[in-house]
A protein has these predicted regions:
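Alpha-helix-loop-beta-strand connector modules within alpha/beta enzyme cores
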Residues: 111-114, 120-137, 182-202, 253-257
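Hydrophobic faces of well-ordered beta-strands that scaffold small-molecule active sites
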Residues: 61-65, 85-87, 114, 139-143, ...
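N-terminal capping/small domains of soluble enzymes
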Residues: 2-138
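Active-site-adjacent beta->alpha loops and helix N-cap segments on the catalytic face
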Residues: 94-101, 123-127, 173-198, 212, ...
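Glycine/Thr-rich beta-alpha phosphate-binding loop at enzyme active sites
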Residues: 25, 29-43, 115, 172-185, ...
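Active-site beta-loop-alpha junctions enriched in small/polar residues
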Residues: 66-68, 90, 144-146, 170-172, ...
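Non-cysteine beta-strand/loop elements that form the S-adenosyl-L-methionine
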Residues: 86-98, 162-170, 234-242
Length: 257
């Protein structure tokens, strides 16, 4: 048994998962945390460099959105050797997210289900946090909203703080995002982003289909892909978590990772 497995099984997994995550956020926000995380950094000299949206990366391994929703611990994460980090997901106004409990573990399957619903401090506070950093690791900002105007405003406000964007219309825990699952609304969003484009962006699509990718799901994806191709979108993220029901969660459902 590894040290991590011993600690997680015997200590961390005894507590609520969101509580543990919040505790780690506090620890990693300490001014000494970057020195601690640098001890666990590995050299990338044997890892193939790659590119994403024109940006050279020292590693193809990245930290996905959701770990540092408020960009509060980027200094510590910057030392871990990721090819890039995705901050957020950020919304225009602060959001509390869904009611708790909103994360549960499936320890036997090495998996978890979350129904967070984009809890974050809002773009104003996150810009304040971002202003404190001079990162070596390339940063992508994940943004989302209930309307095209929300998303385009976030794009403009955050463009000075990252090399690109991940447009998140994929969360299974945010009901209003289904507005963008309509093909016309989706394409209007893309066109609106292209009208103000100053940085590259990629679209994060939701999971379609059940356990297998049936013909109906393939047709849905093909339609989205065609829209992305026709409008010269820089990248695509596939896909968000798998929607499941779980009575432990306050809202009764979430996304399986």
């Amino acid at each position: 048994m590894t040290l991590y497995r011993f600690i997680s099984n015997n200590i961390l997994f005894k507590f609520d998962p969101e509580f543990i995550h919040d505790c780690m956020q506090v620890i990693l926000s300490n001014k000494f945390a970057p020195y601690l995380t640098s001890l666990y950094s590995t050299s990338n000299k044997h890892i193939s460099k790659t590119y994403i949206m024109g940006q050279e990366l020292n590693s193809p391994l990245a930290l996905a959105a959701g770990f540092d929703k408020n960009c509060a611990i980027l200094k510590a994460l910057d030392k871990l050797g990721f090819g890039y980090i995705v901050g957020g997901t950020v919304t225009i106004n602060p959001r509390p997210g869904n009611l708790k409990p909103r994360i549960t573990r499936y320890v036997d399957n090495n998996s978890m289900v979350n129904s967070l619903g984009f809890p974050n401090l809002g773009v104003e506070k996150i810009i304040e946090n971002l202003s404190n950093y001079d990162l070596k690791t390339p940063l992508i900002m994940s943004i989302s909203g209930d309307s095209i105007s929300d998303i385009t405003e976030l794009y403009k406000l955050l463009s000075d703080y990252c090399f690109g964007f991940e447009i998140n219309i994929s969360s299974p825990n945010t009901e209003k995002l289904k507005y963008f699952h309509d093909y016309n609304n989706f394409e209007n969003l893309i066109k609106s982003l292209n009208d103000i484009k100053s940085k590259p962006y990629m679209i994060k699509l939701p999971r379609f289909g059940i356990s297998t990718l049936d013909q109906k799901s393939k047709s849905i994806y093909e339609k989205y892909f065609q829209i992305l191709s026709d409008n010269n979108v820089d990248g695509l993220v596939l896909s968000n978590t798998f929607p499941v029901e779980d009575s432990i969660l306050k809202v009764g459902q979430g996304g399986l990772s």
